[in-house]
Amino acid sequence: MKLLSFKKKPSLTKSQSCPDKLKNLKEQQKDPKNGANYDTATIKSYTLQQHQQQQQQQREDNNMINNENEDFSFNYFDYDEDQESTYSREERLFFSIWRNNKIKRCIFHHLEIFNLMNNINDPITLDQLNLIDSGKLRDYCKIVKIEKNEKIELQCMPIPNHIEKLIFSNEFDKPIKAGTIPQSVVEIEFGEKFNQVLKQGQLPPSLEILKFGKRFNQMVTHSTGELPTSLTTLIFGNNFDQIILKNFIPPNVSTLIFGLNFDQPLSPGYIPSSVTKLEFQENFNQPLTIGTIPKNVKHLKIFSKFPLNQGAIPQSCTTLYYGGDCNQGTKNIPDSVKSLHFLQSIDCNNLTKERSLSKSSSSISLDISGGGSGSGSGVNSTTTSEKITFLQPESICKSVTNLTIELNQGPPNKKYLPMNSVTQLSLGINEFKKPLKSSYIPNCCTSLLLNIGPDYKFQQLLSKSIPSSVTALQFGPNFNLTIMPNSLPIHLRSIDFGDGFNQQLLQNSLPTLIDSIKFGNSYNQPISNNVLSNSNYLTSIEFGKSFDQPLIIGNGIGNLNNNNINNNVTNSNLPITLNKLKFSKDSNFKSLLKIESDSMIEEIEFGDQYNEEFNNQCSLGCTHLLSIKFGENFNQPINNLPISIKKLIFGNSFNQSIKNLPENLTSLSLGTSFSQNLINLPNSLIELKMFNKDFLNNLNFSNNNNENNNENNNENNNENNNENNNENNNNTNSFNDFIKNTTIKRIKVPCLITTLNFIVEKNKSKNCSLLKFYCFVVANNNYTNLVKYNLLLNKSYFEKWSKKKEGQSPRKQRKKKIPTDQRSTKLLLVRKFLYQVFFFFFFFFF
């Protein structure tokens, strides 16, 4: 790959004063005839060399230059000279470095590379890390994944000293030798199959986070040195069930989580006082005495069939997930608990004023039953009873604002609920002998999740079933009742019907103030003209997987030629005020979609199965449309898109010509299959995203003339270079031609990490722009390289870069010899890197 470098900056004589330097450089920059290539960054670097007595004037010059070129502007920490003596030596040293724009840009550059190497979905493996040539790039990588067949031994493939996190794959199950893991590692995550005995010295003394996999079930203690003292987070897998004694857990652990099968007795002092988050799972069934739970625990999750003793839960606890004997209420739960979640069913016969549900909690999650089945949090009860029970007065405190209740056999009377505090209510109902009424729900409730079970025998949601205070309504997955007119609250703004709803909407069944509607995966009913078209406040609507009915937005007449389309729908069935139309990712929608010119829609998102051509079946005639997102399978010509569109996102199957893009387009995203020429892109385009892993090999930005020139250059290069070098030169030349003519400010190609991760940032201003080009390549999974391109560009850079001054002949371009030996190429890269690092640390420390 051909490397691009900075153009050499001209030197200035010492006889010139700083203001004269600045003035001359500005005049040379503004004069296009002198052929000078001075850019704004060069001028700015010289302004930093002015004398102290001219500091005030210098700040004004800097501000003036920064206003002309925002690409190189930074925030200065200005201070008065009289106050300079008040700063400490460290502060003066910091300001002297921070004010140097060159050093500051270098710092941000290294920060960007660090983010590029670590903000990835798939961590780099140890094999890939050892193939990276440059030591600088190795230091940037902080996360490494150990595969199944990789050996982590000092003599064959050591782990570098800069690694901070190790992730072992699920297949890894090999012993680890002492001293193999460096002291720089602070986090280790083992895979599911790891079940090896850990001995002293195998884990580094600096380790802070340790997470075991599902199958791990070995004795590990702090007293014998298996677990380091520095541990702050310790997480065991589901199979772990070893005895816990005193001093087994390191004294600095703050988060301790046990797995599903852990069921060992605990005594006071076994868990260190440093623990603030403690979790046990369903199989834990041990008595808790005073002091067993540390006094500093704030987050506690516990299961136990033994009675909860007074004082067993410390006063420091604020969040409690309790799966024990829930029928005790909150008699022995401290007042400090603000968020309470019961994980098993509660028999309301035992809930009295003395056993009320939390005296001070603001959030409660519980399952109310008469011993019936059901659970509010996924823990099922097998006992059954036909007795209908109700909440008793004052059994739930008046301070609760977030309440979750599962009612299995009968509704509660609202006088037993906190009527003046509950604003968020999740209500589950099943075997009701009476239809749902608004008297079951507090009048202060604004957000309601109504989960009606399959055993609910009523078929309709009657009028005034929900109080008028509700503004956000969500139905559960089993809801499939006919919504009668005026049954929903008049102030309702958003509604989610759930995945089970598939009933036709009736006229006046939805309130006029509603602005957001979401249908579930089962809904596939035709929408009549008089149901939603008059909803003047509706701005967003989303359809699920099964929906495949015609949609018309606007006052036009649709051309219905599809046999699957209901011929009764001829006019607009969606309101013109709609701003966003979305189909779920797995949507099967293929019917008519017609958007008239009077529509106010701005955003459309299609599902993955949509692949219809833009004709009478799909007509986008609106003038306000700004964004379209197509799914994975869309691959149709795009010749009739509205000119108002500013953002286009295509899926991985799209591979059509993009010659006729909207002239106002600012953002374009192309999938992995796209291999067309990027020609005639709109001048308004700012952001371009490409996901094709062969992007560098398919660069076809240039026009025919440039292609002919490239062919001639290739013939000359064939005499001295091999075919691989010619391909790299072609790619670089094509990329240069593209950069010369484009107005794009940002290009992203975030492909798979095993193939290509390519980011280009281009920030344009009046006369100058900065181009940053980072390329992370793992070619054929056996070679890794990170290359940085920095170009300082002005208007005449590509046209006059070979000329010294007007009237002089262009200087001869010196062709860099590309060494054929791979080792020579690596040495050149390493030497250039060492040169840059030397100057960086020189300016930083001296």
UniProtKB/Swiss-Prot annotation:
Statement: the UniProt record of this protein carries the keyword Repeat: yes
Region (Disordered): 1-39, 362-384, 702-734
Positions in coiled-coil regions: 702-734
FNIP repeats: 159-193, 194-239, 240-283, 284-325, 458-500, 501-546, 654-693
Bias type Basic and acidic residues, positions: 20-33
Basic residues bias locations: 1-11
Keywords of the record: Coiled coil, Repeat
Pfam families per UniProt: FNIP
Name assigned to this protein: FNIP repeat-containing protein DDB_G0289381
